Regions:
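Conserved phosphate- and dinucleotide-binding cores of soluble alpha/beta proteins
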Residues: 1-45, 113-187
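N-terminal active-site beta-alpha-beta segment that forms phosphate/nucleotide-binding
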Residues: 43-124, 128
Length: 187
């Protein structure tokens, strides 16, 4: 109803709304019906997060973790990079760095697989466009990126998959983030 919100609290003006759809079956993520730690309502105990299994991906993630310095603001991408926070957690280094996700989470413990892009126990959430403004300003220390292929000349393929059904995955925020990163670590 008109006047029910203060003007600065309005996110979508009524003139732009034709319908409101209530979807009670809407999930929070593709694999999560609802998890209050993702929305910041509760804090999930650090002991509840699973660690990486032993194998090549773990060795790579451990090596990447050695490059991180206390106080770093670090963007992470999908793939092996997404496991680095678990390595720090296991090493008792949780909180040494601040994780920055494209989707807007700052801090906390970034989640994995189809929950990637979310974080439990985040310190803050920014709208994704504001997070990208921060990335474009170069205010972060480094980014941990995954890739599909890297050529001998240093060219990086992040979006073209060789087989169907996934002919292209899309570059996501790769270009914006890597163009403004002080350091880039591929894993």
């Amino acid at each position: 109803a008109a006047g029910s919100l203060k003007p600065k609290e309005v996110r979508i003006p009524g003139v732009l709304v034709d319908y409101i759809v209530i979807a009670p079956e809407q999930t929070q993520t593709t694999q999560t019906q609802y998890e209050p730690a993702i929305s910041g309502e509760i804090s999930r105990p650090l002991s509840a997060f699973r660690y990486m299994e032993h194998g090549p991906a773990r060795v790579i993630a451990q090596r990447v973790a050695q490059e991180l310095q206390s106080g770093d603001a670090v963007n992470i991408g999908f793939g092996i990079s997404a496991n680095v926070p678990r390595i720090l957690l296991e090493q008792g280094r949780h909180g040494d760095v601040t994780w920055l996700l494209e989707q807007g989470a700052i801090g906390g413990v970034p989640l994995l697989e189809f929950q990637f892009g979310c974080a439990s126990n985040a310190e803050a959430f920014l709208p994704s466009p504001q997070q990208f403004t921060y990335f474009q300003g170069g205010g972060f220390d480094l980014t941990l990126m995954s890739f599909l292929q890297i050529g001998a000349d240093g060219s990086v393929n992040v979006s073209h998959l060789p087989a169907r059904p996934h002919v292209t995955a899309g570059c996501g925020g790769f270009i914006d983030i890597t163009s403004h990163a002080k350091r880039i670590i591929f894993s």
